[in-house]
Amino acid sequence: MSYYEDILKAKNGQVLFLLGNEAIARGAIESGLSMAASYPGTPSSEVGDLFYAIHEKAKMHFEYSVNEKVALEVAFASSTLGLRSMVFMKHVGMNVASDAMMSIAYTGTRGGLVIMTADDPSLHSSQNEQDNRHYADLSHLPLIEPTTPQEAKDFITLAFDISEKYSIPVIFRTTTMISHERGLVQVSPRMDQKRMSNFESGKDMFNSLPQFASRNKKVLQEKIANIKALESDRFISVERADEDEWGAISSGVGYAYLHDVIAKYKLSISVLKIGMSNPLPEKSILKFVREHPRIIIVEELDPYLEEKIRALCELENVDSIIYGKMNSYFPNDYEFNMDIVRSGVFKAMGKEDPNSFTKGVESPLVAPRTPVLCSGCPHRASFFAVRRALKLAGMEDAKISSDIGCYSLGAYEPFDIGDYMISMGSSIGIASGIPGSASKRTVTFIGDSTFFHSGIPGLINAKMNNAQTTLIILDNRVTAMTGQQPNPGSRDLDDLDSKQNISIENVVRGTGIDSVVTVDPFNLGKMLHAVTESFKTDGPAVIISRRECAILRDAKEKKAGRHVVYTVNTEKCSGCDKCVEDFACPAISIVGGKASIDPDQCDGCGVCSQRYVCPFQAIEVA
């Protein structure tokens, strides 16, 4: 059996060592999950990886949808038929899905519907670190936050139970450290999946016309009030200290750091851990703060709990002193660690930080390392050709907008590709709106998966308004950055020529754009020609730069027993450094004044052997 099959088939009581995301997937399967949908995004991707691998054996439907909004709509539709359904995404994906989510909150559901958001404090792989707990307030939906992989598995089942009992979607929030930490998880029996029920007709069921939505708003508020009255012990735990002066309230991964600080330094602090952050368990909180005159609140990102607890104490005339983010005991940005939590706790308690003597003298032990594209990455060839074309056309100052994906790394030297990079699909709209773009041409980069996700409306807008931009769609045949997931253009990764795959060329031509060419970026001459010609176009021109992701290609080459490596003919090499300075492949370096290729890193793409990279053609097959 495969690793994922082991997770699926684990028996009741068996203990597994799982990622938080894997525990969530196992918990969903235990809950009788029938349908799941997602658009991949770190740090949520491993949930989809597991479902993609085992969905047939689990007798459930799983799909990678074109974007998060569609994924939620698909899962919602299944839930209206009584099936337990789930959608999951990274935190910024909630922005995309929120349009549908706000209305679905009003209509409610029938089968359980869980909406998982994986937040990314410290922006490990994201363009912001928004705190999606606020979506619970905005949508009036329950919010559940686990602390450990075991809780992640157990709480997902509770989320389905609450959703189904109250006919309401439930938001399930993790963070990077919860999703990607490993821990021991004891599994439970798998529930039988519910059978599809007949759809109950009636426009007032799942219709958001104002006359129905106005009634549903009151129903939604009643649901939240009923859940609030529940205050389930499953989501609340209290750890009592010997003394009553100090108490702490925490949730999510913040609790884990707090627990370790208290244990390591033997602090006398009672702790209230909250697993459901909306609706807030006000009775339990009031009881706790009244028992402790001094309260420390530990939570990552925004003072979400703190603001509510302060307001509650003010309303109920509780005079406990609160120490948190709002009075600068803890930072408002980035993820926490044990040092940050220890520092805040000791500051609140008026104790000397035991590690304060090291502050100001710490220095990085490793030299800064700029992220780079993989050896053999087709994006490197595309960037190289575009930079050369811009130079030849005297357009080196042209504005370049980029998008979300591996190719975002083009912003680093030597390519400097990406004056703008904002959000999924934004590159085309931005390029169309750059001042002067009506007369001076811009260049736009977007990946294949991102193009399908949200780039098409921008392209239609560019055509409608005759934007003077060259759009380069970097089609590496896979959603690469999040872990090699398929997308509409590569539904079958084993057969990239399958008729099931949606043609980017046909989509682009369907907008009315005539200037559409497809080029292999490894052929630098043809790529350079295509880009140069596109600059002569009136209106938008599209170049589809198509070549498999190096990781995807390498897996196939390894399976076939093929591997080509290039080397440098030192007699031909002039030591000009152009292959390193301009092409920036991590396999190439300068050793003893000559170029040198590391055979362990060389991918065998051969692009560096072309005269555009090495004018002396000193790079040859080993």
Ranges and model annotations:
Residues 47-50, 74-76, 97-101, 123-130, ...:
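Short acidic, glycine/serine/threonine-rich loops at helix termini
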Residues 50-57, 259-271, 506-512:
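Short helix-loop-beta junction
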Residues 120-175, 203, 207, 211, ...:
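Conserved thiamine diphosphate
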Residues 58-64, 107-118, 196, 200-201, ...:
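A glycine-rich helix N-cap at a beta->alpha junction
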Residues 1-149, 177, 241-242, 315-544, 550-556:
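Thiamine diphosphate
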Residues 1-21, 146-373, 378-379, 521, ...:
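Flexible, low-complexity linker and terminal segments
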